[in-house]
């Protein structure tokens, strides 16, 4: 009996997987809906009756689960990098010519793949022994959230690929323009574009709900494969064989007139842009040969063997309803045009920044005017020009702050409120402090912060740690569960690295790169920085000795660490047990050899891909440079090194092998 049940379950699974492939991948179904539904219902019944036979590759998982997702944050096995960008065809052609020249010099036949750049949500799929093990969002490139339960419901994501292989794939999850408009119309809180809706669906905690949304996916890159694949073309053939959905508009180019053929393809895709059923915002080019990719390598931001050509922004016409003046955390005054809602490149636009008075005067804008609106880079709404002048004169920014009514001062082209007690500036500081890139206090959204501030519950970042949040229980939107989550998030923020706290203080010109420069020059604690800054003259000399810190930044650091308000905040956080020194694990591990050293890489390595190796070395405190210059401390050389080795030898730069590095430092700790 048991064997008969098991055999029937296996038979049903195989049949349904075959029919899914025929329908979703091959577009040639061999059975009707009734036959398919009957088989699926039978399989669901048997798996519920005999749960011991249910497996992680069952087609029934496509219908979600009633278990609630927790979206655990997990470290990516490989850094998930961005792409270099080109904004005109000349730039793109130069890149193609550069790749062709480098490939030719290294003895490679040049081939390049090209495909539309989907404007969706990036996802990384991890397969172990041929079964989907996890699905991580891009996150910050190092850590992503595991949304596997929701990704399993997407019809074109194979749960099992039929071979015991390991794969790490990048893809783009999207929703069509038509479905976006249809779904958005039914929601109480509508989304600005299809990408945001897709992201919202992916983060729903109940995967049963996700099944009801028509999410789709294109897989476009292999980050790792246990199979031997030599080219992108080989990889695409293999992915098709496994049942993944690939973009049908992807093309491979090689041979004569390479640049010309690619440019013609790009222009053709751009001309057809509005006809695509999903949003695209450019074309991505990639070197076809994987061995050449390894030689070309990576910067800390992007692979050198790929580039994204960004389309020109689409435009629409709208009318200015009102112009409001906003105040940022720095006190910067920004005029914003509120316009009649208009759809551009798949996003509803209702407002656009006007930058400053000079910009308003340059286009001659006032309330009631009809204007051309674009999304620059298909992201940022902008008023490009006045199409029809229906008002008299230009809008004038008041000479007083809309929040505190104090007089504004002009610095360059912008107006600023310099009142340290300005309510909107203070609120901006609190929002920045809580933001994901700073203290990352989950649950304290901008709306929640505005509510707490306007109700006089908080008046600075410090109040977040002294306010009794239990007072919120019973107020609209604040139940016991939500308040407890807020309290837990605030408590967890005390464990953030010191560099995050330093960034969260919002000190002018003190961004994360400058903070890392301080840390790598033994200024890795509050005590060290504040002690140095007590002696202004010595502090200036010491800070200017750090490459990358100029006079303006140095003066702002010294000024901040002599400011009583800022010092009082640091001392408050110190008493609460915040980390006031950057952990050695975040700076340098087990040896001072790599600490602060500037390095570059050439050639390929058997043990690690180049971007993984770069990540491992930078975690030890070293600083990666994408090009050889006299400022390097060493060049790391692998097999088949390029011209960087010759240049490094000419400059007298130290040459090291991976063997040399591993003799000095344990890279795998």
From Swiss-Prot:
Its EC number is 6.5.1.2. It is an enzyme of class 6 (ligase). Zn(2+) binds at residues 401, 404, 417, 422. GO terms for molecular function: DNA ligase (NAD+) activity; metal ion binding. Its cofactor is Mg(2+); Mn(2+). The keyword Manganese applies. Keywords: DNA damage, DNA repair, DNA replication, Ligase, Magnesium, Manganese, Metal-binding, NAD, Zinc. It catalyses: NAD(+) + (deoxyribonucleotide)n-3'-hydroxyl + 5'-phospho-(deoxyribonucleotide)m = (deoxyribonucleotide)n+m + AMP + beta-nicotinamide D-nucleotide. The active site is at 117 (n6-amp-lysine intermediate). GO terms for biological process: DNA repair; DNA replication. Residues 589-669 form the BRCT domain. Transmembrane segments: none annotated. It holds the Pfam family BRCT. NAD(+) binds at residues 33-37, 82-83, 115, 138, 172, 286, 310. It comes from the Bacteria. HAMAP family: DNA_ligase_A. DNA ligase that catalyzes the formation of phosphodiester linkages between 5'-phosphoryl and 3'-hydroxyl groups in double-stranded DNA using NAD as a coenzyme and as the energy source for the reaction. It is essential for DNA replication and repair of damaged DNA. Belongs to the NAD-dependent DNA ligase family. LigA subfamily. This is DNA ligase. It comes from Borrelia recurrentis (strain A1).
